[in-house]
Amino acid sequence: MQAYQREFIRFAIERGVLRFGEFTLKSGRTSPYFFNAGLFNSGSALAQLGRFYASAVIESGLDFDVIFGPAYKGIPLGAATAIALAEQHQRDLPWCFNRKEAKDHGEGGTLVGAPLTGRVLIVDDVITAGTAIREVMQIIQAQNAEAAGVLIALNRQERGQGEGELSAIQEVERDYRMPVISIVSLEQVLEYLADDVQLKQHLPAVQAYREQYGI
């Protein structure tokens, strides 16, 4: 585990973004942990989150030309990542986002910011079912651009609803032949729990969940 990944997990726990206990997910599964990126809800938290995203994409070595933040949650994440790449890594890249509703006045259209051209890095919080990414792919293809990869905060490393199914992330990687980069995966969360005296109590439940639903 990289230092920035350990820092990110600590940061997510401190902000209440990553919690341990018993949570019912939309899928109906009972999960021993829950991740809610909406709680990165202050200026300093968002700035710090952008730095973690930037570290992850730099670490990956991915080549891309423009950052795209899908509406709505991806918009501040894309902006924060673009700022961090410029300020921390001297990579001043264009970024843009989409509107859910097209405007028929002013500049019009559904895209705001830099032109969506070349190799596009999509920035979002998590991939749950992959539906949002499929919508984004249509936007990118309509601009004759190419998706370079997706950058997310957490990879749950969890398969879909059917037995033996791929995870939503693996499906995205397979269907669009692009990588999904995460700041951390469940594997690193398990490693963090094993090393933390206070949180170690949650390790057996998370391990059991991984054994049941993991990929």
UniProtKB/Swiss-Prot annotation:
Keywords: Glycosyltransferase, Magnesium, Pyrimidine biosynthesis, Transferase. Its EC number is 2.4.2.10. Its cofactor is Mg(2+). Pfam families: Pribosyltran. PROSITE patterns: PUR_PYR_PR_TRANSFER. The keyword Repeat does not apply. It catalyses: orotidine 5'-phosphate + diphosphate = orotate + 5-phospho-alpha-D-ribose 1-diphosphate. The keyword rRNA-binding does not apply. One of its GO terms (biological process) is 'de novo' UMP biosynthetic process. GO terms for cellular component: cytoplasm. It comes from the Bacteria. SUPFAM superfamilies: PRTase-like (SSF53271). Pathway: Pyrimidine metabolism; UMP biosynthesis via de novo pathway; UMP from orotate: step 1/2. 5-phospho-alpha-D-ribose 1-diphosphate binds at residues 26, 72-73, 99-100, 103, 105, 124-132. One of its GO terms (molecular function) is magnesium ion binding. Orotate binds at F34, F35, T128, R156. InterPro entries: OPRT, Or_phspho_trans_dom, PRibTrfase_dom, PRTase-like. PANTHER family: OROTATE PHOSPHORIBOSYLTRANSFERASE 1-RELATED. Homodimer. Catalyzes the transfer of a ribosyl phosphate group from 5-phosphoribose 1-diphosphate to orotate, leading to the formation of orotidine monophosphate (OMP). Belongs to the purine/pyrimidine phosphoribosyltransferase family. PyrE subfamily. This is Orotate phosphoribosyltransferase.
